[in-house]
């Protein structure tokens, strides 16, 4: 049996019918069943799309995210075998996103309107205790400004829809463009509604999709994403650029940094350079990220790259160039001092690679590169150039405050200056402290803080100035000693002096405490005695390596100090210069030591590999002998292990049996005690019963039960006697009281009965009197009522009679019209039947006449044929002589004349029939008068026989053949 025809419009019609009766859920389920059926695999996707669109519309309206996701995935699974199917999947995904976005927009508009109305209604605003109590039991949860659950649920549904569509479209070459569009819309959604957590999940999801696409490059399959394609890679790169932009706008700095790494890796493998405008926007976002991260060098580098790209913008103005150039130069000036080299791993080194920098640039190099670049330095504000001269070129700690006082007033009016106030203040403060350490050896705190107090907006409190001073000391730009009693600050001139004195004290203390520690260790070892291992051997005493770190550092610094003090440039330098020289020397020395260690390690590895090679060669030569020895040792060890395991298993079995017996015994005792205690006759303490066996417990129970039974019997006998006397006394006392109560109840019932009876009688009397009053009133107006009734009846009767006569006349007229209509219709039908009968009769007569004419013509032709053939040859057996092809003229002409005559008669008969029919039709209005037949026209003798037309000749020939 063939399957029913595939009609998607029926599914839509069925869904509309269910929606019309309020069954939207059933309509959604019916559409889901239709689009997930296997039969649509062989259908044209364009015919199924309207059903899917209807399914999406209802699903979005009902917020059935899981059902929608399942339906879309099943639909893709069924039709993804063809290109048209994947195109349909893309169209369906776009429709789904459009529906969701329009719905969330309408819900947001409605929520804004409701909120506006609530604000207008409730002038007090906010959340009150009354509103909180009302919100507990109100279904709409619409307390003014308190609960936004409706819009939140739609936001959650929108986010889940975006996720479902991205999962539907991912890693398919034919759906890349749609996938890219949905990604951009999802990021716009997160930005518009400030969905930070959702944006983090989106970024992680996109990374997983890219990882999956990268993994599939080595696989084979249909419609796989080709990352070697320039357009595909550019789309992924544009997504990451937008991801960085949205991360910065949402202030998700960690996510922005991860997105920057994604962009860096994609740009490395991309063969096509991004657009300058896109790169400029990207570097502008990097500027913000690196400013927040606290790395001014990266911040300035990103500014320079942005400016280089922005300078190619034809729409850029000179004012913008001036602002950006000044900002770049100010950011470079605000970079922290890095004159002392850092020791150890720089955590920001990885970030420099993101800007294609081979090494970390110094502050001095950055400033020098900006000054040498005329396209930047030539457009810098003069105030910043003056600031650079004050801080970097001609810095004087005594005059810096006066120089900055007028300059900062001008700079404060600049829009770009406010964000660099804090880093610029740190740079100037660091310069002030370094200059003060060179100028003073000991200075009062008030004088130093006065010297470090800068004009507004760079001013700080005394506490913040002290924090900056301590930070400078931590970073080794100065070395200070603060005496709070005398309020003095002492600056060290040599970094080795303070540390050497401190280290010597610590070393002496450690030397004094070392013997005591050694004695305590020896006493502890004697008390514990020699320790043994599991095999019974005495463990050799291992000496713990004790490294006195302070002493080690002290010795190393002494060596470094001896080396550096022999250098004239070190002795004549300031504290900061000495620290810089010492660190550079240490870095160089450590680098040399590391190179030596690396060489030693390489040599050791080489020797180890050579020894390993020799050992392998030796093992190969003695492999057979070693194998026998090893096999014998393995067998012995295996036998010993098996014996030990067997013994251990036997011991464990015995212990297991004992434990099981004890457990059963304990369980039985516990069960017995529980049952006895549950009955309540005897109570046995479970803790005390642990030391008793089962028989002893039974004897205790029997003794306790016997004792309790005798006590119970005696108490019962006493209680029965007491109860008998008490019951008798109670009955004697309560008998008069019960009689009084019965009498009282009878009196009360009698009084209630009389009151009820009186109430009923009074009500009946009142009702009777009221009805009698009504009757009296009605009797008074009864005559008037009858007169009015007769008057109204007479008036209405005449009106009704007139209406009846009118309706009767109308009915008669309608009947006559109907009769005339029926008669006319029947007359016309009779005329039509009569015409049909006449036409049939004429056709029959005409057919008979034609048959008669045909017969006569056939007879004439036969007679003519007989005359043309000689008699002798017809009767004989010989063949007739050959006849010439053309007969003589005298022989042919009679036959032709006969044929012309027959045709003439036939024409006359046809004309007569037509005239008769025409006459009857014209006289149809008077059927009683018969139509006069038309007299056929007699041909004129002089005119001769009329020639036959070609059609008449052919018709005559057909009739002749039919007659034969």
UniProtKB/Swiss-Prot annotation:
Q: Where is the composition biased (Low complexity)?
A: 923-945
Q: Where is the composition biased (Basic and acidic residues)?
A: 839-865, 895-914
Q: Which residues carry this modification: Phosphoserine?
A: 508, 691
| Disulfide links within the chain | none
One Pfam family, please name it: eIF3a_PCI_TPR-like
Please indicate which superkingdom the organism of origin belongs to.
Eukaryota
Compositionally biased spans, kind Acidic residues:
508-544
Any one GO cellular component localisation term in the record:
eukaryotic translation initiation factor 3 complex, eIF3e
| BP GO terms, sorted | formation of cytoplasmic translation initiation complex; translation reinitiation; translational initiation
Cellular compartments annotated: Cytoplasm
Gene3D superfamilies named in the record: 1.25.40.860, UVR domain
Task: Enumerate the UniProt keywords alphabetically.
Answer: Coiled coil, Cytoplasm, Initiation factor, Phosphoprotein, Protein biosynthesis, RNA-binding
Q: Where is the composition biased (Basic residues)?
A: 955-964
Subunit structure of this chain's protein:
The eukaryotic translation initiation factor 3 (eIF-3) core complex is composed of TIF32, PRT1, NIP1, TIF34 and TIF35. A subcomplex of TIF32, NIP1 and PRT1 mediates the interaction with eIF-1, TIF5/eIF-5 and HCR1. The factors eIF-1, eIF-2, eIF-3, TIF5/eIF-5 and methionyl-tRNAi form a multifactor complex (MFC) that may bind to the 40S ribosome. TIF32, NIP1 and TIF-5/eIF-5 comprise a minimal 40S-ribosome-binding unit. TIF32 interacts with 18S ribosomal RNA and RPS0A.
Miscellaneous comment as given in the Swiss-Prot or TrEMBL entry: Present with 52700 molecules/cell in log phase SD medium.
Family recorded in the similarity comment: Belongs to the eIF-3 subunit A family.
What is the protein name stated in its UniProt record?
Answer: Eukaryotic translation initiation factor 3 subunit A
């Amino acid at each position: 049996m063939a399957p029913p025809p595939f009609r998607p419009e029926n599914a839509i019609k069925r869904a509309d019918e269910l929606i019309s009766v309020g069954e939207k859920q059933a309509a959604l389920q019916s559409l889901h069943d239709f689009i997930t059926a296997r039969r649509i695999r062989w259908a044209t996707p364009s015919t199924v799309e309207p059903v899917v669109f209807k399914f999406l519309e209802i699903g979005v309206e009902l917020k059935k995210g899981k059902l929608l996701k399942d339906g879309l995935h099943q639909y893709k699974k069924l039709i993804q075998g063809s290109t048209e199917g994947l195109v349909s999947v893309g169209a369906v995904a776009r429709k789904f996103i459009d529906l969701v976005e329009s719905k969330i927009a309408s819900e947001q508009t409605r929520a804004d309107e409701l909120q506006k109305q609530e604000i207008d209604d409730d002038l007090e605003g906010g959340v009150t205790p009354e509103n909180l109590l009302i919100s507990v039991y109100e279904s709409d949860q619409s307390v003014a400004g308190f609960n936004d659950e409706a819009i939140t649920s739609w936001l959650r549904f929108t986010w889940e829809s975006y996720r479902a569509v991205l999962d539907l479209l991912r890693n398919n070459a034919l759906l890349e463009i749609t996938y890219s569009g949905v990604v951009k819309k999802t990021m716009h959604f997160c930005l518009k509604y400030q969905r930070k957590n959702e944006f983090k999940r989106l970024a992680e999801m996109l990374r997983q999709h890219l990882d999956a696409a990268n993994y599939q490059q080595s696989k084979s399959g249909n419609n796989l994403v080709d990352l070697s394609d320039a357009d595909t890679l550019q789309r992924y790169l544009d997504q990451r650029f937008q991801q960085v932009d949205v991360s910065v706008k949402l202030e998700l700095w960690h996510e922005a940094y991860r997105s920057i790494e994604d962009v860096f890796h994609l740009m490395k493998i991309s063969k096509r350079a991004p657009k300058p405008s896109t790169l400029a926007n990207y570097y502008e976002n990097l500027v913000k990220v690196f400013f927040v991260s606290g790395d001014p060098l990266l911040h300035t580098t990103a500014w320079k790259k942005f400016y280089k790209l922005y300078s190619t913008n034809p729409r850029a103005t000179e004012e913008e160039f001036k602002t950006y150039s000044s900002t770049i130069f100010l950011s470079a000036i605000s970079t922290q001092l890095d004159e002392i080299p850092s020791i150890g791993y720089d955590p920001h080194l990885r970030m420099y690679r993101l800007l294609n920098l081979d090494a970390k640039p110094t502050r001095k190099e950055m400033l020098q590169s900006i000054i040498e670049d005329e396209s930047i330095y030539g457009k810098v504000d003069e105030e910043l150039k003056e600031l650079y001269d004050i801080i970097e070129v001609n810095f004087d700690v005594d005059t810096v405050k006066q120089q900055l006082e007028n300059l900062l007033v001008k700079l404060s009016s600049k829009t770009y200056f406010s964000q660099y106030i804090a880093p610029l203040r740190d740079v100037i403060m660091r310069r002030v402290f370094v200059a003060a350490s060179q100028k003073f050896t000991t200075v009062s705190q008030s004088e130093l803080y006065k010297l470090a107090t800068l004009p507004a907006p760079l001013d700080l409190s005394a506490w913040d100035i002290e924090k900056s001073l301590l930070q400078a000391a931590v970073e080794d730009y100065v070395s200070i000693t603060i005496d709070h009693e005398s309020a003095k600050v002492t600056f060290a001139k040599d970094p080795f002096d303070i540390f050497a004195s401190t280290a010597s004290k610590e070393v002496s203390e450690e030397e004094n405490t070392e013997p005591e520690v050694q004695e305590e260790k020896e006493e502890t070892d004697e008390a514990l005695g020699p320790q043994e291992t599991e095999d019974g051997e005495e463990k050799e005493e291992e000496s713990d390596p004790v490294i006195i770190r302070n002493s080690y550092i002290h010795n190393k610094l002494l060596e470094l100090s001896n080396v550096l003090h022999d250098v004239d440039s070190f002795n004549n330098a300031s504290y900061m210069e000495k620290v810089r020289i010492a660190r550079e020397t240490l870095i160089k020395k450590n680098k040399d030591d590391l190179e030596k260690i690396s060489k030693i390690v390489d040599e050791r590895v080489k020797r180890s590999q050579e020894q390993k090679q020799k050992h392998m060669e030796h093992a190969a030569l003695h492999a057979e002998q070693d194998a026998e020895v090893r096999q014998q040792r393995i067998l012995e060890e295996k036998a010993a292990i098996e014996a030990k395991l067997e013994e251990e298993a036997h011991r464990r079995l015995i212990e297991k049996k004992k434990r099981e017996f004890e457990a059963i015994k304990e369980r039985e005792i516990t069960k017995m005690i529980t049952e006895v205690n549950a009955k309540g006759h005897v109570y046995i303490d479970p803790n005390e019963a642990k030391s008793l066996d089962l028989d002893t417990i039974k004897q205790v129970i029997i003794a306790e039960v016997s004792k309790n039974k005798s006590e119970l019997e005696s108490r019962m006998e006493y209680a029965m006697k007491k109860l008998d006397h008490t019951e008798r006394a109670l009955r004697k006392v309560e008998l008069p009281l019960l009689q009084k109560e019965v009498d009282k109840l009878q009196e009360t019932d009698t009084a209630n009965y009389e009151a009820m009876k009186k109430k009923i009688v009074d009500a009946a009397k009142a009702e009777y009197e009221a009805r009698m009053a009504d009757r009296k009133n009605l009797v008074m107006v009864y005559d008037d009522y009858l007169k009015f009734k007769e008057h109204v009846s007479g008036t209405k009767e005449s009106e009704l009679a007139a209406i009846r006569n009118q309706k009767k006349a109308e009915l008669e007229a309608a009947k006559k019209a109907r009769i005339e209509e029926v008669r006319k219709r029947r007359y016309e039908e009779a005329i039509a039947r009569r015409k049909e009968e006449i036409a049939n009769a004429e056709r029959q007569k005409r057919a008979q006449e034609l048959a008669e004419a045909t017969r006569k013509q056939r007879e004439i032709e036969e007679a003519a044929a007989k005359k043309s053939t000689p008699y002798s040859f017809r009767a004989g057996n010989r063949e007739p002589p050959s006849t010439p092809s053309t007969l003589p003229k005298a022989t042919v002409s009679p036959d032709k004349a006969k044929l012309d005559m027959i045709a003439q008669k036939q024409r006359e008969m046809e004309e007569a029939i037509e005239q008769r029919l025409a006459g009857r039709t014209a006289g149809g209005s008077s059927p009683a008068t018969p139509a006069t037949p038309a007299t056929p026209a007699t041909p004129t003798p002089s005119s001769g026989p009329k020639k036959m037309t070609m059609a008449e000749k052919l018709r005559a020939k057909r009739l002749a053949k039919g007659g034969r």
